[in-house]
Amino acid sequence: MIEKSIKAEIVKANARAANDTGSPEVQVALLTGRINELTPHFKANAKDHHGRRGLLRMVSRRRKLLDYLKSKDADRYTALIAKLGLRK
């Protein structure tokens, strides 16, 4: 799990308004943080298939949110993937 202070930092860095916690940008950033935190675990524990299922679920959810954001506002999408260092 992400520590509360780190989570608040991520929300603050990606929020569109002062109390924004539910925008796609914030949700994608939080999922990216959780995914990045779990990656070393799976390098050390390659046979943790039950945990990997949860990781793949998070990756899929992030992909769906990114697809939604791309369809609604392509400029925000490109800015977000550049900021988070995802692909391209």
Curated annotation (Swiss-Prot):
GO biological process, alphabetically ordered: translation
Alphabetized UniProt keyword annotations: Ribonucleoprotein, Ribosomal protein, RNA-binding, rRNA-binding
Statement: the UniProt record of this protein carries the keyword Cell inner membrane: no
Gene Ontology MF terms: rRNA binding; structural constituent of ribosome
InterPro entries: Ribosomal_uS15 (IPR000589), Ribosomal_uS15_bac-type (IPR005290), uS15_NS1_RNA-bd_sf (IPR009068)
One cellular component term from this protein's GO annotations in UniProt: cytosolic small ribosomal subunit
Known function: One of the primary rRNA binding proteins, it binds directly to 16S rRNA where it helps nucleate assembly of the platform of the 30S subunit by binding and bridging several RNA helices of the 16S rRNA.
Subunit structure: Part of the 30S ribosomal subunit. Forms a bridge to the 50S subunit in the 70S ribosome, contacting the 23S rRNA.
PANTHER family: RIBOSOMAL PROTEIN S15, BACTERIAL AND ORGANELLAR, SMALL RIBOSOMAL SUBUNIT PROTEIN US15M
Name of the protein this chain belongs to: Small ribosomal subunit protein uS15
UniProt organism field: Polaromonas sp. (strain JS666 / ATCC BAA-500)
Gene for this chain: rpsO
